[in-house]
């Protein structure tokens, strides 16, 4: 609960609420809507009819728990049962049975689904809302061309445009356009009806030529003309029923189905009163749209802003799941129809249960969760990442935009985003502005609109009422800006306040204000709301910080931030990472893996998460925070999870930082750190890596898991048990065998070694023909084996192979090359780890932990880090924690600076250290060089900011290649760490080597180490024998490739060798 002096208390909604509401809407309404659309299915002779009785459908509780579904790589789903019946029309007999339709993946308490043991989340998509939109564009002559675009529910478009002669055309594709009269006639109207239903009949008559009259003389002629233009068919097509069906399928069903939202928008924009259940485009819509277009041409009416959120709709998890359910039912309908026909053909008596199979529904949802762009693997790097992932909004995906084609205008911040989509939190790179994040209080309305809350200010009533407004409603109100939140009641009448009205910012009297913002975080997403003093930062750096907080690694010893924003507790609780008491009671037992709680006549065992791997290889682990015998209340934290302390988010550490240059080691965002951070495990984190292997049944027989692997050294097999699987608790190094596996193979007589053939001939011993295919620990994987899982799928066929997974725990201290960052976009790479005695130290002798470059502050304009740094120092000395809401200048000018300086002054006074606050240079202090003991020339800013260690770690990225694979075409080393690739020496690198004059190294780079096949083969032999490496004589493979490409363009490339003696030309082919 956070409150404001004038607005009373307001509760922040649950951060997973959007996902929960969407899934509940799908279960309660979406399932029934799609089941009602399922048709009655008859056989060809119309003797048997099959139908579903939708009134009684039920979902069964899952037979497995969430944790077991993850462990065994299963789907956490519920079985759907519907009553169905077969009716024999001749005898009027009916057979009714309960039918199993299929499995529907359920949503868990985190707002995610578990599919094949993987946490997946469906993100919200922003689409253009169906309806009609008018806009004006300048043509190549500089004349305004007015168009009206009708967008269907499926994304299809029909454009109406008016030319300089006031003729109206309907454009059904980019190249083809037809007269509005032809389109109206093809939709069923004659000329008299057209003229009676328009406001400007004289304009329609003005472009009615004799040729046009012939085209619309009958509906058949109009349909033929429309078909010819739409399909670009030459000649004279003949009118037929099949032609009408093709036009109906290709044009009217795809481009003319408006849907419920489109019909509402169409009625509202064109002032129509067509019933809402009539969801297809009608001739009346076309004529009304043409009338509005003519009015636009003559200066009447307003153009539409396509990027305004009132013209967008949110396609939530409910809509996506409902679409997939409808698709599955269409597939099921085809299956049932085929099964009925087959049963009658073979003279079998079908039953409802025999007709229906669960395959269509199950496979549809599996492919949706596995392949759909909006269904993503849940990012579980830390608790914040889990929460933010479900609140993303994307313009990308089916029916949406692409990163290559989206314009700057779409990516830009729009005034209607205020309080709905965060103006800061978006992705970096090609998708900037296309993937955003919903604000804290935003919610999705009934028709897919994004709603934001406001307080209603009423002169009559003293009660404050909260309203949720959609984007098309709030622009009609005078809304007071957020900086007038703290005005006291007495002074309000005399105040002139800034307000927002119709996307403009005005200054008005308080009496004119109808609504006001009610929460400091209302405009920001969760990630941006966790940045203290965000108002003092440049927005670009705040964007980086929002993204980098999601990359923070949970540390072994987490610590709460001294300076926060007050949102840390709710983020941690809603993420589901800490264990929370659901009932009040008494703790009767605690252990490392469970807590037992006793209440009024019941006993509950609460299992704890033990060293669970996230999909980013971070360690999820819960630690008990309650003691045996204690009484607890409902909602109390029982156990902290990864990156939480006391139920609050704790992503990093409060460490002592100085902003100063140090021997060039913090040049260009490099960071200098003390060895204390390594030896005291300040930034030590645990990572769990997963390695798996499968056993198949091959044509030569089944693969075997065994510890008897021939031709391998004994020390590589030292950790295997008698079954050939690595033992729990073993310490494994690179190259060790984790799972011993032999694959049978067919051996020919010629493939046997001579000694094998001798053994067979003399002793009759059958030599093993198995190939060693063991699971070996790759480079950089050393650690402790903490878990081995043997997953056996049901059936045990070769299509369902057995899987063995090995989980290895790694302990990683901070090292040179790791990435660290603050909460203000101030990021850097560790450049050197200094002994603590060499680090600069304060006047009380405390050595600094980290040294940042001071030049990184003024140019980046992220001054918030300086406020946090100084306030953190005061908090550590006073043993206080601060929770500062953003934009505190609304209370008084320079509020942030006054708070920081007053706390620093108090800290210096209470601790007896006057250097903490020196009036000549507040926030700065004189510090000393640890190597010499001499003071530095200038005072330095010191403090305790909150610094995070990010997932970008040098252990995952450092790579070296001695030998490896080559590309087939260019014969050059492959690219990338995963392929054991090499570092490319490109054009600029060649220039650099030329600049140093290292000709031999350059020749090696371009020949032996790259694509000179013969030369690199000779290098190994000459190196072993000690001979001189021969110089490459002919051209490398890349040059040969160039010649071949030129030959493919009919350009023959040859070079000539001219003799010095007689200048006789000897031709030599390349």
Curated annotation (Swiss-Prot):
User: Per the database entry, which stretches of residues form a coiled coil?
Assistant: none
User: Which coarse location class applies to the principal site listed for this UniProt protein?
Assistant: plastid
* A Pfam cross-reference name: RNA_pol_Rpb2_7
Q: Which GO terms describe its cellular component?
A: chloroplast; DNA-directed RNA polymerase complex; mitochondrion
Q: Does the keyword NAD apply?
A: no
What this protein catalyses is: RNA(n) + a ribonucleoside 5'-triphosphate = RNA(n+1) + diphosphate
Specify the superkingdom: Eukaryota
- Alphabetical list of InterPro entries matching this protein: DNA-dir_RNA_pol_bsu_ext_1_sf, DNA-dir_RNA_pol_su2, DNA-dir_RNAP_su2_dom, DNA-dir_RNAP_su2_hyb_sf, RNA_pol_bsu_bac, RNA_pol_bsu_CS, RNA_pol_Rpb2_2, RNA_pol_Rpb2_2_sf
The keyword Metal-binding is assigned to this record: no
GO biological process terms, alphabetically, are: DNA-templated transcription
Give the main EC class.
transferase
* Subcellular localization(s) per the UniProt record: Plastid, Chloroplast
Q: Which Gene3D superfamilies match?
A: 2.40.50.100, 2.40.50.150, 3.90.1100.10, DNA-directed RNA polymerase, beta subunit, external 1 domain (2.30.150.10), DNA-directed RNA polymerase, subunit 2, domain 6 (2.40.270.10), RNA polymerase alpha subunit dimerisation domain (3.90.1800.10), RNA polymerase Rpb2, domain 2 (3.90.1110.10)
Q: What EC numbers are recorded for this enzyme?
A: 2.7.7.6
Q: What are the protein's UniProt keywords?
A: Chloroplast, DNA-directed RNA polymerase, Nucleotidyltransferase, Plastid, Transcription, Transferase
Gene Ontology MF annotations = DNA binding; DNA-directed RNA polymerase activity; ribonucleoside binding
Q: Which family does it belong to?
A: Belongs to the RNA polymerase beta chain family.
Per the entry, what this protein does is: DNA-dependent RNA polymerase catalyzes the transcription of DNA into RNA using the four ribonucleoside triphosphates as substrates.
What is the annotated quaternary arrangement, including any partners? Answer: In plastids the minimal PEP RNA polymerase catalytic core is composed of four subunits: alpha, beta, beta', and beta''. When a (nuclear-encoded) sigma factor is associated with the core the holoenzyme is formed, which can initiate transcription.
Q: What's the protein called, per UniProt? A: DNA-directed RNA polymerase subunit beta
Please name the source species.
Populus trichocarpa
